[in-house]
Amino acid sequence: MLKNKNKFYSLWLLLIISLVFVLQLLIPKFTDFFLLNGSALTNFQYWRFLTAIFLHGSLTHLLFNLFALFFFGIILEKEIGSKNFLLVFFFSGILANLIAVNFYESSLGASGAIYGIIGMLTVIKPLMMVWTFGMIMPMFIASIIWITADVLRTLGAFGTTNIGSIAHLSGIAIGILLGFLFRGFVKR
């Protein structure tokens, strides 16, 4: 069993991400210093793979991620425990950023980490009912829809967007893999 005492790290992450957004608004060049871009590798600025997770490009971007982290993060943290939740969050987020930096000029946001949470929940709680696109559906169906939308977006079906679909797809793939690796240890 993967559980350990719940310390509500998902709620602390919500607070930290929100505070970082306030700093982005108040401090000129704050975002530029922590943003993930090509210089992260060429200039040995490896902290950017982590710090970019806490940055957001707009209030809408922030609110979508906070909403998803609140609902999915709390559920996963209760299922696998706080320490394991943090491992999934940071492992998915950093690895998704390592992949995304090869496709985008710059990248920011917690989406890769959150999609990792979603991916793991898809494996360990596939029939959990979630509300998305105005409907209630099983988690695995919602994930198929989200994956399909991101694949189509990556292929340009929706025109040019600022959405990091590669980070989304990488995060959910990592979360699904982690879910299969550890699902035998998760209490059902």
Predicted segments — roles?
Residues 1-188:
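A detector for small-residue-rich transmembrane helices and their helix-helix packing motifs
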